[in-house]
């Protein structure tokens, strides 16, 4: 278990509000949010329009309305940060959205209890493979079928520009953002018992942001 994630809230005080404001500060950030919402919508629709879904970590709730627009009836917004959850409560499309204080490393939900789980903008903060596998195993345990994961990956202009920049030092738990190679992260998905259904690039050939739609392999 990664103690730094479970015991340290990175977004207390005004940090959560500042995070929310950052993604609405100019045309570029607003367009990126819109594109991220669009690829999430594609993944939800391709998964067969699930009835229940969880967004973990939900952050400030920027993606919650997408689930409702796709017909999700039972929606849970989950995050390890109480600061993020306070902001997310006000971003909920309706009061029926459940709010859960829990960690992606130890999700307080029963096995096979959610049709579709989205884990967005999280995995590129995990520099240690064991942490990534812990999170993948938890997502697989709680999901009935599909998981969507977004992160930074290579094969685009933004990653090419960063090619000579040394990566931040590896730390256990939630750390600085790292561009993960697709030939590194995709085998980890397979090792965790998923198959890759599809992937969606937020800004193809330009941005590092990619969303993977995964499906639990039948045993």
Name what the model sees in each region.
Residues 118:
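A conserved beta-strand element that flanks and buttresses the S-adenosyl-L-methionine
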Residues 106-111:
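Short conserved loop adjoining the S-adenosyl-L-methionine
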Residues 54, 60-105:
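Class I SAM-dependent methyltransferase SAM/SAH-binding core
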């Amino acid at each position: 278990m990664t103690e730094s994630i479970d015991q340290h809230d990175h977004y207390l005080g005004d940090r959560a509000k500042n995070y929310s404001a950052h993604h609405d500060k100019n045309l570029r950030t607003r367009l990126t949010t819109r594109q991220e919402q669009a690829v999430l919508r594609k993944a939800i629709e391709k998964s067969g329009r699930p009835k229940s879904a969880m967004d973990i970590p939900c952050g400030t709730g920027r993606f919650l309305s997408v689930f409702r627009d796709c017909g999700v009836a039972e929606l849970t917004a989950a995050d390890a940060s109480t600061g993020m959850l306070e902001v997310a409560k006000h971003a909920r499309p309706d009061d029926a959205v459940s709010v859960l204080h829990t960690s992606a490393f130890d999700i307080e939900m029963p096995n096979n209890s959610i049709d579709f789980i989205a884990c967005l903008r999280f995995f590129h903060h995990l520099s240690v493979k064991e942490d990534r596998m812990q999170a993948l195993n938890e997502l697989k345990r709680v999901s009935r079928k599909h998981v969507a994961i977004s992160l930074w990956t290579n094969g685009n202009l933004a990653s090419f520009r960063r090619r000579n920049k040394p990566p931040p030092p590896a730390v256990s738990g939630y750390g600085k953002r790292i561009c993960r190679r697709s030939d590194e992260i995709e085998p980890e998905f397979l090792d965790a018992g998923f198959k890759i259904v599809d992937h969606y690039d937020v800004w193809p050939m330009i941005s590092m942001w990619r969303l993977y739609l995964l499906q639990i392999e039948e045993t």
